[in-house]
Amino acid sequence: MPYGGDVWVIHRNSAAREMLGDGRFVREPFRTGERVVPYFLDFPDFLKTTLQFEDPPHHTKLRKLVQRSISPKRVKAMRDSAVAFANELIDAMVAKGPPANLVHDYAIALPIQMLSNLLGVPPEDREKFEKWSHSTLSVAGMTEDEIAANMMELAIYMSGLIAQRRAEPRDDLLSALAAARDKDDTLTDDEILTMAILLIVGGFDNTANFITIGILSLLRNDDQRELFLSDIDGLAATAAEEVLRHGRMQMGLPVAGGGGLVPFVATEDVEIDGRVIAAGEAVLVDPSAAGHDPQAVETPERMDITRQNNPHLTLSYGVHHCLGAPLARMELQVGLSEIFRRLPGLKSEGPAEIDMNNLTQPVTNLPVSW
């Protein structure tokens, strides 16, 4: 890798699941600074302090705390408000008239609203999170001082909000995090802060990109778009999963060779798929390649929104399975459904622009009309 030295890269779906489910692979050496994260970009230091770099049993305790507030049951209850807000965004787009930047006007705004509701962030403060999240994930194009200043703003803001929720609890995730701190002295304020910020960073930036890529995928596949329009409610769930699996290819990016999931280090010699990963060696999963493994997926090169067997690993697997997966899936389903329900004639008006200086390489501009 350009950074952090050599790393084993797993492309086969079954081997990826085997490794991700094996507790002998850990991330502590990256968190402590003993090892540099082997990656295609210089991995942001802040992210190495977050939950995804913790290992059990501490990781398990922290994760359970947040999972209670992002349970499938709670996310299901949030769906109606997501649908309502998606339609408000579409109303605003229609009122302004085409062309529109689908990313700014729709795909980013929807997950920001939903995550802010979950965390209990006041409406007037929500636009700040777009700047803060992009800064956290920036790997070029911004100076270290600019990134540090934005991170400090975010940390100060969230610390203040957590303190408010401890004093005046509400029915939101920050209140639950603050209450947990009061009941459990082993959970520090810094841990609460990093969990909240990780949800902000991962909870809307990635989801916004999934929504954008999903819409673009349907715009580029006439047969799949027509099929989706014929049964939006019936196909929303499987369409969302296919976007998670196949969206990278629809962007014109290679099936393999992406950055992959966050790497692990083997604590002892471990055999995976006939290969021995030696103690101390790093290994990562390329989820795009694993999602196009012909041994796991039939006709993997084809976009099929009716696909039932879809064992993609875009949201990872095992103890590090994406914490916000229920919320991300719901937002992606709603984001795809409502835009095509309201604007069935949606069409692209230019190439998608991608920010290659960001860890997640998000689409920043997708001009559309209807």
Regions found by a protein language model. Give the residues of each.
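Cytochrome P450
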Residues: M1-W370
